[in-house]
Regions:
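Alpha/beta-hydrolase-fold serine-hydrolase catalytic core, especially in secreted/extracellular enzymes
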Residues: 62-70, 78-79, 349-351, 358-512
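Short conserved active-site loop signatures built around small residues
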Residues: 62-159
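Gly/Ser-rich "nucleophile elbow"/oxyanion-hole loop immediately N-terminal to the catalytic nucleophile
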Residues: 159, 209-255
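Short beta-strand element of the alpha/beta-hydrolase
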Residues: 160-169
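Active-site machinery of serine-nucleophile hydrolases
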Residues: 177-219, 223, 341-344, 348
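Short glycine-enriched nucleophile-adjacent loop
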Residues: 254-266
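A conserved short beta-strand
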Residues: 268-291
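Active-site-adjacent alpha-helix of alpha/beta-hydrolase-fold enzymes
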Residues: 303-380
Length: 514
């Protein structure tokens, strides 16, 4: 356990001018040892591993990174079909929606199934009235008549297929985001899923405090699908498996899916219990792509993630959601229910927008013209990472195909299927036991599992909250240990053990062994 791509900025500033914080254990994050070896500095290091990865993407431009991807990703040991390749099913497509859309002909003239709007007024009450008025003037409807529009890709074959809803995040509301997930919608359909890109563009633009509305709208779409599954006149009658549902969300949509999953288990809206809930859909898995976290806090708490499997992916070069917000969601997700797992993947050189083909490589609006984009993965490379891991995760958690479990424990098991860059992964399935969470007390010498923590020769040793990057200085809501050491020869990474050490001494049987 040690640092990865970087450590919190305030710790980095504590190092000597012109140096980078360093420290890693070989084999934990392939390539990071070579990245850090030339550095000469006292080295503050944040523990545990993935929490440190979450704190920073890369502390310097990529010219300082020596990639070992050709070696690390040279083999594939997973004994299962490559989920990143097209599946065996032919894909068909249709659109459902209001049939009255003022701005998009596809939801006006091309809908195969017409839908009724829903009244979302309670979920938008906290938003500036003037901003909403201008918005509704553009769209031609208001909060009392929010449309349920969706683009559907499905297997053009007989059978019963799981349902996957995909929802975009915030963007210019006049540059429609929902077409940007056709790449994953078609891919999932070829693998035997009914994939829907949900339109929530009317919630985009310069408004805030709307993420509960985004999540609630997803559940309103699921209500349509539950009714359609029992309707013999529906185009996919008898082919929708509503007991196996997954939600996939990008950016604010990545938080909206956690909100939807939380609302799905509740009997009332937390913000106003006069509004009853009765959802109870068969949501099994959440897939979050560079999500935000904490924009909506029901009962002044972060939305819980319980009773579902959770996967989050984030890019090191994300210039929109610059901190790995989804790592905080990952940390609080529980996997105590049978069959649930959680996993995260951090992708070096991936940005925010290329997961959506409409958004592209410009993460920060007009200012994006000054970004050095040569360091980014190409859009197709970035989306191929998504095809492999999103499809593999749904195979594992929605279909129950255990052959794909190893790729979430260690991404190197599918190295031959991945674009050549660097990755860091984390996984939990309920079988883990915490040795030291640094949250049991304020004593640096105690461990969660009992026993004692001892150290020698450190220049820094303390425990504390792990902050995110950025001006807001939010935290990951988890504690870590900060360690520093200085090697006589200056190479703090490969320093001999007697320079400094840190160990957790556990009592017999602390981990269930004899």
């Amino acid at each position: 356990v040690a640092a990865g791509f970087g450590v919190p900025e305030r710790e980095a500033r504590a190092a000597r001018p012109g140096t980078l914080p360093a420290g890693t254990i070989p084999g934990k994050i392939p390539g990071m040892r070579r990245h850090l070896r030339p550095l000469r500095a006292a080295a503050p290091v944040a523990l545990p591993l993935l929490a440190a990865l979450a704190a920073a993407a890369c502390v310097q431009p990529p010219r300082l990174v020596v990639s070992d991807a050709d070696r690390v990703l040279a083999t594939t040991t997973l004994d299962a079909p490559n989920p990143g390749l097209p599946g065996p099913h032919r894909v068909a497509h249709f659109v459902y929606g209001s049939g009255t859309d003022r701005r998009r002909a596809v939801f006006r003239d091309s809908v195969a199934v017409r839908t009724r709007p829903v009244n979302g007024t309670p979920f938008l009450r906290g938003i500036d009235a003037k901003a909403l008025k201008a918005r509704w003037r553009y769209w031609g409807f208001d909060a009392t008549a929010l449309p349920r529009n969706g683009r559907v890709w499905h297997p053009d074959t007989a059978g019963s297929f799981p349902l996957v809803l995909i929802v975009h995040g915030n963007h210019n509301m006049k540059e429609f985001s929902d077409p940007g997930y056709e790449w994953i919608g078609r891919h999932l359909a070829s693998h035997g899923y009914i994939a829907v890109s949900v339109d929530e563009n009317f919630l985009n633009g310069a408004i805030r405090s709307e993420n509960d509305a985004r999540g609630w709208m997803l559940l309103q779409h699921l209500a349509l699908w539950r009714a359609w599954a029992a309707d013999p006149a529906f185009p996919l009658a008898g082919r929708v498996d509503t007991a196996r549902i997954a939600l996939m969300g990008h950016s604010r949509g990545g938080e909206a899916i956690t909100v939807a999953a939380a609302f799905n288990r509740l009997s009332h809206w937390p913000d106003d219990a006069r509004i009853p809930f009765a959802f109870g859909f068969g949501i099994r898995a959440l897939v979050a792509i560079a999500p935000v976290d904490g924009q909506y806090q029901p009962a002044d708490r972060l939305p819980p993630v319980r009773g579902v499997s959770y996967f989050v992916m984030h890019g090191s070069h994300d210039a929109d959601v610059s901190s790995f917000n989804g790592q905080r969601t990952y940390l609080r997700a529980t996997v105590s229910d049978p069959g649930t797992v959680k996993a995260s993947l951090y992708v070096y050189r991936a940005n925010h927008g290329q997961w959506n083909t409409v958004w592209g490589d410009n993460d920060v609006g007009p200012m994006g013209r000054w970004l050095a984009k040569r360091s980014l993965l190409s859009g197709e490379e970035q989306r191929q990472v998504g095809r492999v891991f999103f499809t593999g995760f749904l195979a594992l958690t929605v279909r129950g195909d255990a052959r794909y479990a190893p790729m979430f424990r260690d991404y190197r098991t599918v190295g031959g299927w991945l674009p050549r860059t660097q990755y860091a992964s984390q996984h939990a399935d309920g079988g883990e036991r915490a040795v030291a969470t640094y949250e049991e007390d304020i004593d640096v010498a105690t461990a969660t599992a009992g026993g004692a923590i001892r150290a020698h020769g450190l220049t820094q040793w303390r425990e504390g909250m792990l902050p995110m990057r950025g001006a807001g200085r939010a935290s990951f809501e988890t504690n870590v240990a900060y360690l520093g050491w200085k090697a006589p020869g200056g190479d703090s990474v490969s320093a001999p053990r007697d320079t400094a050490w840190y160990e957790v001494a556990l009592p017999a049987g602390a981990l269930g062994d004899s």
